[in-house]
From Swiss-Prot:
Stated name of the protein: L-rhamnose mutarotase
Pathway where it operates: Carbohydrate metabolism; L-rhamnose metabolism
Record-linked HAMAP family: L_rham_rotase
Subunit record text: Homodimer.
A molecular function (GO) term: L-rhamnose mutarotase activity
The organism of origin for this protein: Listeria monocytogenes serotype 4b (strain F2365)
């Protein structure tokens, strides 16, 4: 398993809405994540800066990245775009992080 981490950014005033939407994550989106090798997916929030820290373990990063091509992922992005910084294609603005330490 490969560990993948990134940072994303909420627009101010959307912390509760972000949590609400993820608490009700669409079953089709859950299925797509699992089908693309995602496991142990967590998202943490820095409440002072509206910064999100996402962590997911993936079987194969290349396969996981293909989720972006799915209709359900693009629909999810469109749904989330009004409450977080997003690219022109509605994907979240995300900064991939480099792992610098791991303790098994």
């Amino acid at each position: 398993m490969e560990r993948v981490a990134s940072i994303m950014y909420l627009y101010p005033g959307n912390q509760e809405e972000y949590k609400k939407r993820h608490d009700a994550l669409w079953p089709e989106m859950k299925e797509a994540l699992k089908a693309h090798g995602a496991a142990n997916y967590s998202i943490f929030l820095d409440e002072k800066t509206d910064t999100l820290f996402a962590y997911v373990e993936v079987e194969d990063k290349a396969i996981y990245d293909k989720i972006a091509e799915t209709e359900i992922c693009q629909k999810w992005w469109k749904y989330m775009a009004p409450i977080m910084k997003s690219n022109p294609n509605n994907s979240p603005v995300a900064l991939d992080l480099k792992e610098v330490f791991y303790l098994a």
